[in-house]
Amino acid sequence: MHQIEQCHLWHTKDKQYIVNNKNNRQEKEKHINITYKGMRCSISGKQYEIQIWNILKHCSIRGSPFHTNTLQQLGGSTSNIDIQCNFLSNNDIGIEIKKCRTPDWMQCSIYFDEKKNRWFSSKSRNKHPTISDLFNQLLENKTIFDNATPFFLKEKITYPEWHHIKQSTDKWNDHHFDIPDSTIRNLYREKGCHYIQISEYGLYHLDEDICGFLTPVFQIEQQIRVRVKVHSRENKKGFCRLSIMASCLPKNINSLTKSDFSLDCREKLPKNIAYHESSSSSSPSNIF
């Protein structure tokens, strides 16, 4: 990383930021803790998917295997469906898997269009265009970061510089806006999911309970959160990579009514799913 002898001076239209580089080590250590926290969330989510996979691979419905995908085919931290199951045909049921305390549910990067004077979802980076359209509706008429492209997205800065800027003003704090209670359901339906499994709360349907699990619909007060996200604290040239992210999430997950059914515990599986102790499905098969 390049060294700055004393300080780096940032000028913007409304404020001057001074970064004292004597505190670089302390700033880096703070960020390492933040990075590890984010990594733990991702790892915890993956472990929860595997826990459910280890149960579903032993299950059947209507006399046929309910889940026949391999461990490598789990969605993980990607835009793919977390777990696909079989009802009327192979992989026709999509299930979103969520740890209840995860900070972001459905998220996408956004940018400010100076000609149209509003924020938009970065559609080119989203494999589901209709999801981008839904985010655009949520962002309409929202004032975020003074409705301008943040200067640090136009200029290269180091992570210690960004951390000092963030601590020096509340201008770049997260923004939260209330959104309809159906938003998360609609977003995951567009992704191809029919159900959502939430740790500690259980299984819910998003639109119609097409498998007849007798699950409740996922219904809870929701909000959209807009924040500056650090994707990388240091590239080969010593600069960090930032973006503006929008994500939908429950306002208070504790207010969610628990489901009677869950996929993370064999004793709480829906009544029409049969668990077979000796059954194992290690590779996909065409069963219908």
Located regions from the model:
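Catalytic centers of nucleases
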Residues: T35-D113
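Interfaces and regulatory segments of ATP-dependent nucleotide/adenylate/phosphodiester-chemistry enzymes
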Residues: C7-W10, D14-K15, E29, Q197, ...
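A short, surface-exposed helix-loop junction/capping segment
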Residues: K13, R25-R40
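Alpha-helix boundary/N-cap detector
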Residues: N23-Q26, Q47, N126-T130
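Charge-dense, extended regions
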Residues: D264-S280, P284-F288
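Catalytic cores of nucleic-acid endonucleases
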Residues: T35-I43, E96-T215, Q219-R225, S232-C240, ...
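Serine/proline-rich low-complexity intrinsically disordered segments, especially terminal tails, linkers
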Residues: K22, S44, V217, M245, ...
